[in-house]
Protein backbone atom coordinates (compact mmCIF):
# COMPACT_ATOMS: atom_id res chain seq x y z
CA UNK A 1 0.00 0.00 0.00
CA UNK A 2 1.33 3.45 -0.90
CA UNK A 3 1.53 5.98 1.91
CA UNK A 4 1.00 9.71 1.33
CA UNK A 5 4.24 11.65 1.98
CA UNK A 6 3.65 15.10 3.49
CA UNK A 7 7.11 16.25 4.55
CA UNK A 8 10.68 15.65 3.42
CA UNK A 9 9.36 14.76 -0.03
CA UNK A 10 12.87 15.24 -1.42
CA UNK A 11 13.93 12.01 0.33
CA UNK A 12 12.07 10.16 -2.44
CA UNK A 13 14.81 11.40 -4.79
CA UNK A 14 17.68 9.97 -2.73
CA UNK A 15 20.28 8.58 -2.89
CA UNK A 16 22.21 11.49 -4.34
CA UNK A 17 25.95 11.98 -4.74
CA UNK A 18 27.51 13.71 -1.71
CA UNK A 19 30.14 16.25 -2.72
CA UNK A 20 32.12 19.28 -1.59
CA UNK A 21 30.86 22.62 -2.91
CA UNK A 22 33.63 25.21 -2.85
CA UNK A 23 33.29 28.95 -3.18
CA UNK A 24 35.38 32.04 -2.49
CA UNK A 25 34.79 35.52 -1.07
CA UNK A 26 35.49 38.76 -2.92
CA UNK A 27 38.67 38.90 -0.78
CA UNK A 28 39.73 35.42 -1.99
CA UNK A 29 38.88 33.64 1.30
CA UNK A 30 37.96 30.04 0.32
CA UNK A 31 34.96 28.18 1.70
CA UNK A 32 33.61 24.64 1.48
CA UNK A 33 30.34 22.94 2.36
CA UNK A 34 28.99 19.42 2.00
CA UNK A 35 26.16 19.24 -0.50
CA UNK A 36 24.01 16.65 -2.26
CA UNK A 37 21.51 18.83 -4.10
CA UNK A 38 22.89 19.14 -7.62
CA UNK A 39 21.77 18.03 -11.03
CA UNK A 40 22.70 18.55 -14.65
CA UNK A 41 20.04 20.45 -16.60
CA UNK A 42 21.64 20.81 -20.04
CA UNK A 43 24.29 18.99 -22.03
CA UNK A 44 24.78 21.72 -24.65
CA UNK A 45 25.69 24.08 -23.28
CA UNK A 46 26.67 22.16 -20.14
CA UNK A 47 24.72 23.55 -17.17
CA UNK A 48 24.32 22.22 -13.62
CA UNK A 49 22.18 23.44 -10.73
CA UNK A 50 23.22 23.42 -7.08
CA UNK A 51 20.68 24.27 -4.38
CA UNK A 52 22.00 25.94 -1.24
CA UNK A 53 20.23 27.25 1.88
CA UNK A 54 19.68 31.01 1.65
CA UNK A 55 21.03 31.44 5.18
CA UNK A 56 24.33 29.71 4.48
CA UNK A 57 27.68 31.41 4.13
CA UNK A 58 28.17 29.47 0.90
CA UNK A 59 25.06 31.03 -0.67
CA UNK A 60 26.30 34.47 0.35
CA UNK A 61 29.66 33.87 -1.34
CA UNK A 62 28.22 32.37 -4.52
CA UNK A 63 25.87 35.34 -4.85
CA UNK A 64 28.86 37.70 -4.44
CA UNK A 65 31.33 36.05 -6.82
CA UNK A 66 28.97 34.20 -9.18
CA UNK A 67 31.01 30.99 -9.23
CA UNK A 68 31.44 27.62 -7.51
CA UNK A 69 33.17 24.25 -7.90
CA UNK A 70 31.63 20.81 -7.38
CA UNK A 71 34.36 18.51 -5.97
CA UNK A 72 33.58 14.79 -6.08
CA UNK A 73 35.18 12.83 -3.21
CA UNK A 74 35.73 9.15 -2.54
CA UNK A 75 35.03 7.30 0.69
CA UNK A 76 38.52 8.34 1.89
CA UNK A 77 37.09 11.81 2.50
CA UNK A 78 33.95 10.75 4.41
CA UNK A 79 35.25 12.25 7.67
CA UNK A 80 35.85 15.58 5.96
CA UNK A 81 32.37 15.45 4.38
CA UNK A 82 30.87 15.16 7.88
CA UNK A 83 32.94 18.03 9.26
CA UNK A 84 32.17 20.35 6.34
CA UNK A 85 28.46 19.58 6.66
CA UNK A 86 28.23 20.37 10.36
CA UNK A 87 29.90 23.78 10.80
CA UNK A 88 29.78 27.17 9.11
CA UNK A 89 32.77 28.57 7.27
CA UNK A 90 31.77 32.10 8.26
CA UNK A 91 33.96 31.93 11.39
CA UNK A 92 35.85 28.65 10.90
CA UNK A 93 38.46 27.52 8.40
CA UNK A 94 36.73 24.29 7.43
CA UNK A 95 39.59 23.24 5.15
CA UNK A 96 41.97 23.26 8.11
CA UNK A 97 39.42 21.69 10.46
CA UNK A 98 38.70 18.86 8.00
CA UNK A 99 42.32 18.37 6.91
CA UNK A 100 41.58 19.31 3.31
CA UNK A 101 44.22 20.68 0.96
CA UNK A 102 43.18 23.18 -1.67
CA UNK A 103 44.52 23.53 -5.19
CA UNK A 104 44.09 26.38 -7.64
CA UNK A 105 41.22 25.71 -10.03
CA UNK A 106 41.81 25.84 -13.79
CA UNK A 107 39.30 28.58 -14.72
CA UNK A 108 37.67 30.06 -11.57
CA UNK A 109 38.86 31.55 -8.28
CA UNK A 110 36.91 29.07 -6.12
CA UNK A 111 39.33 26.33 -5.06
CA UNK A 112 39.55 22.67 -5.99
CA UNK A 113 39.98 20.07 -3.24
CA UNK A 114 43.00 17.76 -3.50
CA UNK A 115 42.10 14.08 -3.23
CA UNK A 116 38.75 14.43 -4.98
CA UNK A 117 38.36 12.40 -8.17
CA UNK A 118 36.32 14.90 -10.14
CA UNK A 119 35.77 18.64 -10.35
CA UNK A 120 33.19 20.80 -12.13
CA UNK A 121 34.03 24.51 -12.28
CA UNK A 122 31.04 26.77 -12.86
CA UNK A 123 30.11 30.41 -13.43
CA UNK A 124 26.60 31.35 -12.27
CA UNK A 125 24.37 32.66 -15.06
CA UNK A 126 21.08 32.55 -13.17
CA UNK A 127 19.91 32.41 -9.56
CA UNK A 128 16.38 31.30 -8.69
CA UNK A 129 14.70 31.93 -5.34
CA UNK A 130 13.46 28.42 -4.48
CA UNK A 131 11.80 28.49 -1.06
CA UNK A 132 14.43 28.22 1.67
CA UNK A 133 17.16 27.73 -0.95
CA UNK A 134 18.73 29.47 -3.87
CA UNK A 135 19.07 27.39 -7.02
CA UNK A 136 22.30 28.45 -8.70
CA UNK A 137 22.45 27.60 -12.41
CA UNK A 138 26.10 27.18 -13.31
CA UNK A 139 27.59 27.23 -16.78
CA UNK A 140 30.26 24.54 -16.72
CA UNK A 141 33.55 26.28 -17.54
CA UNK A 142 35.80 23.27 -16.92
CA UNK A 143 35.25 19.66 -15.85
CA UNK A 144 37.88 17.00 -15.21
CA UNK A 145 38.18 13.64 -13.48
CA UNK A 146 40.75 11.02 -12.50
CA UNK A 147 40.71 8.71 -15.52
CA UNK A 148 41.57 5.64 -13.44
CA UNK A 149 38.05 5.85 -11.93
CA UNK A 150 36.23 6.45 -15.23
CA UNK A 151 35.16 4.00 -17.92
CA UNK A 152 33.25 5.15 -21.01
CA UNK A 153 32.57 8.47 -19.30
CA UNK A 154 31.02 6.87 -16.20
CA UNK A 155 32.31 6.31 -12.66
CA UNK A 156 33.56 2.82 -11.89
CA UNK A 157 32.66 1.15 -8.61
CA UNK A 158 36.33 1.49 -7.59
CA UNK A 159 35.78 5.25 -7.23
CA UNK A 160 33.62 4.55 -4.15
CA UNK A 161 31.69 7.80 -4.52
CA UNK A 162 29.69 8.65 -1.36
CA UNK A 163 25.91 8.69 -1.72
CA UNK A 164 23.65 10.66 0.60
CA UNK A 165 20.61 8.59 1.57
CA UNK A 166 18.88 11.42 3.46
CA UNK A 167 19.29 12.71 6.99
CA UNK A 168 22.64 11.71 8.48
CA UNK A 169 23.11 8.61 6.31
CA UNK A 170 25.88 8.35 3.71
CA UNK A 171 26.98 5.14 1.99
CA UNK A 172 29.20 4.22 -0.93
CA UNK A 173 29.13 1.36 -3.41
CA UNK A 174 31.95 -1.14 -3.83
Predicted regions and their residues:
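Basic, polyanion-binding surface patches
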Residues: 1-174
Amino acid sequence: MLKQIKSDIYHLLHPKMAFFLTSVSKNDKPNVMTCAWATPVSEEPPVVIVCVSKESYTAELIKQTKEFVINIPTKKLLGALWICGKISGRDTDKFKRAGLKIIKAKKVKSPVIDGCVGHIECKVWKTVDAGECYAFFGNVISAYADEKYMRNGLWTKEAEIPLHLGGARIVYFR
